[in-house]
Swiss-Prot record:
The keyword Nucleotide-binding applies. Signal peptide: none annotated. This is DNA replication and repair protein RecF. One of its GO terms (molecular function) is single-stranded DNA binding. It comes from Clostridium beijerinckii (strain ATCC 51743 / NCIMB 8052). One of its GO terms (biological process) is SOS response.
Length: 367
């Protein structure tokens, strides 16, 4: 899978952009605040219909205009697919795939797969569980539309249950109806998350040993708010919901379920969130991202597009070497301030684009 070309109109600081990419490595070079990341963001947006940087779509629209437009031509399984997205200031968006309207966001997932690695990803390891859940949900949704459906339904029922809890006066028979629905969707979500974590562990073990020259072992552990040991998740979840009714009533929210789960990362049996160095935390997220590349290829038969947003300068030599060795069969779009650190690792298949003030100064030159 690869992006053949990108077309933008009134997208952030790009009034108009049309750029042809190579199937291999594409490097966008320029100073800060010139628009390099905006290009990666537009590619990411076509996979998920959302930005990795903001939840407010209106921020994507050039301030002098009322709409922004993104168009990608994608090569996938020897066929071309075209994604067109119009973004409006009122928060609405119109999406088409091969000129056919996409009515629901879930219909977009799986059309185009990406994995992004940016400096902000360090927060996944260091900060709130919601960031780790979001990462799992995004990765699973893009390879399994049914996962996204179950997640949407779960959150809908969860919201209705919480409204009922906040009312403080309700029949437990009505609550039972919500609990049965929640357990059905939660069972699917948890099973797919566990499968994904198992795959991350399989590929991650190999990747992490290579990055660290065999000095470290990595392990990802899913932390579930419900007992998983006897294999009867639905029964265990229903019991836990009943046990927590009083607490949930007092707080006006549901205290257990996939929306409260988390995962931990251990290096040599040490929790990296609490005790890991910044280097180990970086390596953990790097391992997870590259394991995701392998998983997506296993499921879809093709590597996704890899987006590297100004991360190479943040990495030591071993990590940098691992990335640049590993991307030879993967279309990769890199942003950086300079190519001095890349010259020794990249070949003549690489295209370099110089970016300045929302413009591409050249249409790709070989390194």
């Amino acid at each position: 899978m690869y992006v053949k070309n990108i077309n933008l109109l009134n997208y952030r600081n790009y009034k108009k952009l049309s750029v042809e990419l190579t199937e291999n490595v594409n490097v966008f070079v320029g100073d800060n605040a010139q628009g390099k990341t905006n290009i990666l963001e537009s590619v990411y947006y076509c996979a998920f219909a959302k930005s990795h940087r903001t939840s407010k779509d209106k921020e994507l629209i050039n301030w002098e205009n009322s709409t922004a437009y993104i168009s990608l031509l994608i090569g996938k399984n020897r066929l071309d697919k075209k994604i067109d997205i119009n973004i409006l200031r009122d928060g609405k968006k119109a999406i088409k795939v091969n000129n056919i309207k996409v009515n629901k966001i879930g219909e977009l997932f799986g059309i185009f797969n990406v994995v992004m690695f940016s400096p902000e990803d360090l927060k996944v390891i260091k900060e709130a569980p919601s960031l780790r859940r979001r990462l799992l949900d995004m990765e699973l949704s893009q390879v399994n539309p049914n996962y996204y459906f179950n997640l949407v339904q779960y959150n809908k029922v969860l919201g209705e249950r919480n409204i009922l809890l906040k009312s403080r006066s309700f029949s437990e028979d009505i609550l039972d109806v919500y609990d049965i629905q929640l357990s059905k969707y939660a069972d699917y979500i948890i099973s797919k998350r566990l499968e994904y974590i198992n795959k991350i562990n399989f590929y991650g073990d190999i990747i992490h040993r290579e990055i660290t020259s065999g000095k470290e072992e990595i392990n990802f552990k899913y932390n579930c708010t419900v007992n998983l040991e006897n294999g009867k998740f639905k029964d265990n979840y229903l019991k836990k919901l009943k046990d927590n009714i009083q607490k949930d009533r007092e707080k006006g929210l549901t205290s257990v379920g996939p929306h409260r789960d988390d995962f931990s990362v251990f290096i040599n049996n040490i929790d990296t969130k609490i005790f890991g160095s910044q280097g180990q935390q970086r390596t953990s997220i790097l391992t997870m991202k590259f394991a995701s590349l392998k998983i997506i290829r296993e499921i879809t038969g093709e590597y996704p597009v890899l987006l590297l947003d100004d991360v190479l300068s943040e990495l030591d030599l071993n990590r940098k070497k691992y990335i640049l060795r590993s991307i030879k069969d993967i279309q990769t779009i890199i942003t950086c301030a300079g190519i001095e650190d890349l010259n020794d690792y990249l070949d003549d298949k690489v295209k370099i684009f110089n970016v300045s003030n929302g413009q591409i100064l050249n249409q790709g030159r070989n390194i």
